From Swiss-Prot:
<protein>
    <recommendedName>
        <fullName>Beta-lactamase AER-1</fullName>
        <ecNumber>3.5.2.6</ecNumber>
    </recommendedName>
</protein>
<feature type="active site" description="Acyl-ester intermediate">
    <location>
        <position position="83"/>
    </location>
</feature>
<keyword id="KW-0378">Hydrolase</keyword>
<dbReference type="GO" id="GO:0046677">
    <property type="term" value="P:response to antibiotic"/>
</dbReference>
<keyword id="KW-0814">Transposable element</keyword>
<comment type="similarity">
    <text>Belongs to the class-A beta-lactamase family.</text>
</comment>
<keyword id="KW-0732">Signal</keyword>
<dbReference type="InterPro" id="IPR023650">
    <property type="entry name" value="Beta-lactam_class-A_AS"/>
</dbReference>
<dbReference type="InterPro" id="IPR045155">
    <property type="entry name" value="Beta-lactam_cat"/>
</dbReference>
<feature type="binding site">
    <location>
        <begin position="248"/>
        <end position="250"/>
    </location>
    <ligand>
        <name>substrate</name>
    </ligand>
</feature>
<dbReference type="InterPro" id="IPR000871">
    <property type="entry name" value="Beta-lactam_class-A"/>
</dbReference>
<comment type="function">
    <text>Hydrolyzes carbenicillin. Methicillin and oxacillin are weakly hydrolyzed.</text>
</comment>
<dbReference type="Pfam" id="PF13354">
    <property type="entry name" value="Beta-lactamase2"/>
</dbReference>
<feature type="disulfide bond">
    <location>
        <begin position="90"/>
        <end position="137"/>
    </location>
</feature>
<keyword id="KW-0046">Antibiotic resistance</keyword>
<dbReference type="GO" id="GO:0030655">
    <property type="term" value="P:beta-lactam antibiotic catabolic process"/>
</dbReference>
<dbReference type="GO" id="GO:0008800">
    <property type="term" value="F:beta-lactamase activity"/>
</dbReference>
């Protein structure tokens, strides 16, 4: 149910591997398997404890940039995407910006008829006012504004455009089928609007730490996630003030609660984390507290 794997070498380290081939041949038998920089025993105990307490299904994946290893619990099981899709929807929009087919400065008009539930930013910027795509993505990612997310959805070509973008970065699992708020239904067994923790962590790693986006677009998306205004009760509640976190949360039917994040511990390479909870009758506050407690274990088990 839980897995520890080692990432394959990238192009950037192949050269170093090549020039050291003779040395490797001599001492290979003395080189240990890369060690995960986290105490996976404590992690699995923490996740299973919260899963039991919530009477829920919990999935979690962690990628450790320090060692190139990935750990997961239920990492290949499907969970509702909920609002975690907003980071990836805006990544798809930024890819269009990189391709010169759209500009963050381009303006759109939002009518009253377009408003859906939980739109704290866009409800204040209705037609005849116009709003730039930059502000729209900021609203969607930093404030989880649902109408803003739907505007992005349309701009990237709807579900077809979203899914095509995810496939273009190697994500064969994540799928978006509906707009806000319908996508948050979360009915068990329904594959619509679902993902896996493994897919989310791998895709977020490529987008924020890799080269799926240009440097400027990557920086912009990271900033929107650093400025997340609705995630204070989750992993942020567990981390010291000198740890940076860029995150996006989600919530939906059947007790679904989720978060994807890149975390920068001081003087270390980042961790990429995805936690998904569903099929529980527990309150959102209880799920928030569960994620925060998992975050405490994550923090405490980072290798010194």
């Amino acid at each position: 149910m839980y897995v520890l794997s080692v990432e394959k070498p990238t192009l950037r380290n192949k050269f170093a591997a090549g020039i050291g081939v003779v040395l490797v041949c001599v001492v290979a038998s003395f080189i240990p398997t890369p060690v995960f920089a986290l105490d996976t025993t404590k992690l699995i105990q923490a996740v299973q404890s919260e899963e039991s307490a919530l009477h829920a299904r919990v999935g979690m994946t962690v990628f450790d940039s320090n060692t190139g290893t990935t750990w997961n619990y239920r990492g290949d099981e499907r969970f509702p995407l909920n609002s975690t899709h907003k980071t990836f929807s805006c990544a798809a929009l930024l890819a269009k910006v990189d391709g010169k087919s759209l500009s963050l400065g381009q303006s759109v008009s939002i009518s009253k008829e377009m408003l859906v539930t939980y739109s704290p930013i866009t409800e204040k910027s209705l037609s005849p006012e116009t709003v730039t795509f930059g502000k729209i993505c900021q609203a969607a990612v930093s404030y989880s504004d649902n109408t803003a997310a739907n505007v992005v959805f349309d701009a990237i070509g709807g579900a077809t455009g979203f899914n095509a973008y995810m496939r273009s970065i190697g994500d064969e699992e994540t799928q978006l089928d509906r707009k806000e708020p319908e996508l948050n239904e979360g009915t068990p067994g329904d594959v619509r609007d679902t993902t896996t923790p493994n897919a989310m962590v791998n895709s977020l790693r490529k987008i924020l730490l890799g080269d799926a986006l240009s440097a400027s677009s990557r920086s912009q998306l990271t900033q929107w996630m650093l400025d997340d205004q609705v995630a204070g009760a989750l992993l942020r509640a567990s981390l010291p003030s000198d740890w940076k976190i860029a995150d996006k949360t989600g919530a939906g039917g059947y007790g679904s609660r989720s978060i994807v994040a890149v975390i920068w511990p001081p003087s270390k390479q980042p961790l990429v984390v995805g936690i998904y909870i569903t099929q529980t009758k527990a309150s959102m506050q209880a799920s928030n507290q569960a994620i925060a407690r998992i975050g405490v274990v994550l923090k405490d088990t980072v290798a010194p």
